[in-house]
């Protein structure tokens, strides 16, 4: 039974063999990283490889749909009836707001009794559109297509965790970005070096950055999209590029602390609990010391 079905309609208990072989779980497609499924870490690399050449890098994106991973924010309906801004990427906003392209289950707006075709990949237009051959290179890349379907079936979520200081929110480091662009201009082309930062570096998962994957030969596990690609990950030149990509991403200013944002200007609304506790513990220690 699903969570929106009537309890009285539960089917009778079916008896089956007690000793079937337990099937091994198949890991999901895409890169491995700590935490839950992240749009920026799993889906954006697919878009960077197969989509942004038409939907982002041109002056006028095809179908007026930009799939660049440039950070942005947009207004959503909160809960309950509390409008707020969500931090995401241009690509996420474009896919989410194109009518009918993505079909998600929004809280308190689901159908009374959910059916398989109500939401997710089966109800969204995106998966059938890709299966029809819109992007042959993506359709040929089955792992990439499975990443898209997994994202749709996970209700098109953006962040991979509930941290207040997320990898997805990191920014470019000015000096690091300048050094990276200089390297790309010298090794590949000035045109590549001038592309938007988000088209070169994935701040959420730098190892999946287009600057790295496109520069690596296909037979070495890369995308082989640039002229004279690097032959392997072990050559000094590729290791230098990897270090430059890492340095082009600024670290988060703060780290979560005891489930709170720990930021100078609190955004979680709960830092006062920890701060009050620390204040009174210090006060009690002072009083205890004075009583001796």
Set out the residue ranges of the language-model regions.
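Aromatic- and Gly/Pro-enriched helix-to-coil junctions and flexible linker segments
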Residues: 1-292
